[in-house]
């Protein structure tokens, strides 16, 4: 008799995706982040669902409803902080996942990569709208500043902004629709994750050496289920330490002040995971130019496969490219720091130099270095 997991229509899909999936025998811990992202998404949807049961998306009561969740709802405080800090863990895992893809040439699976980039955009949009919901000062002004960027679009910009706002400023209509979209998008993300996995399982996973691994595959379970549990324990430990000891460490104190359209905070800035893009936006003194640079800073990932000029897929055996890669990582950390600083000397010039370096490394230096390395192979 055939095992039910191999014959039942639904069990068969699960079996082929998570149990008997042939996996390269040499993938490292950098391949853990896919499963961690799945767990983060599950955590966010679960905590978010329970928070939505007590939250009210009305400008008069939104701030108080969040306070009510933290003070009066049983374990509401832990739900709220798991959700807020869970978003930070989500982005840490996301950036490490993308970084792994860049380092080991996983972007050569173009369908999987492109859906991943769309997923990144969708998760960023979801996080931005979620940040508006507590209706604190930074929520309100963050929403005002970021949505107002669309007014830079020629001809239709102003109409577009007012259409998104649902009025002439960020108000009740804006908050209500942001809540609706913030609730809906995670389910769309879940569907997109399934498509992401569908395309990945068409080709199989890449590996650290960047060479075909068809000759040496092992089943996903028990080898990588056990390996992923280690990563999960590390992530859960970090998240719980953050939630239980310093839940507001990554937040902004201004968001504990109710939204006031008549008082602008001294420094308007987004959550830490958007600071690198915000720094690129601010480094260009022109509004439309800044918006284009902001979008390009993430959309540039789409063209990465076209910029691959190396004869080797992975960076494992390409020391010059490795140096550039870690320079890019340092540059992104610099941009993240600059994004949180006030707009004054010397931060402005550092931000501009870091932005130029970011685009130069990806568009110019990486492809040229790969060509040099191709010649070095002939020595």
From Swiss-Prot:
GO biological process, one term: mitochondrial electron transport, ubiquinol to cytochrome c
Cofactor note: Binds 2 heme b groups non-covalently.
Coiled coil residues, start to end: none
Cofactor: heme b
Keyword annotations of the record: Electron transport, Heme, Iron, Membrane, Metal-binding, Mitochondrion, Mitochondrion inner membrane, Respiratory chain, Transmembrane, Transmembrane helix, Transport, Ubiquinone
Keyword Metal-binding included in the entry's annotation: yes
Binding site for heme b b562: 83, 182
Additional note from the record: Heme 1 (or BL or b562) is low-potential and absorbs at about 562 nm, and heme 2 (or BH or b566) is high-potential and absorbs at about 566 nm.
Role of this protein: Component of the ubiquinol-cytochrome c reductase complex (complex III or cytochrome b-c1 complex) that is part of the mitochondrial respiratory chain. The b-c1 complex mediates electron transfer from ubiquinol to cytochrome c. Contributes to the generation of a proton gradient across the mitochondrial membrane that is then used for ATP synthesis.
Self-association and partners: The cytochrome bc1 complex contains 11 subunits: 3 respiratory subunits (MT-CYB, CYC1 and UQCRFS1), 2 core proteins (UQCRC1 and UQCRC2) and 6 low-molecular weight proteins (UQCRH/QCR6, UQCRB/QCR7, UQCRQ/QCR8, UQCR10/QCR9, UQCR11/QCR10 and a cleavage product of UQCRFS1). This cytochrome bc1 complex then forms a dimer.
Family membership: Belongs to the cytochrome b family.
Protein name stated in the entry: Cytochrome b
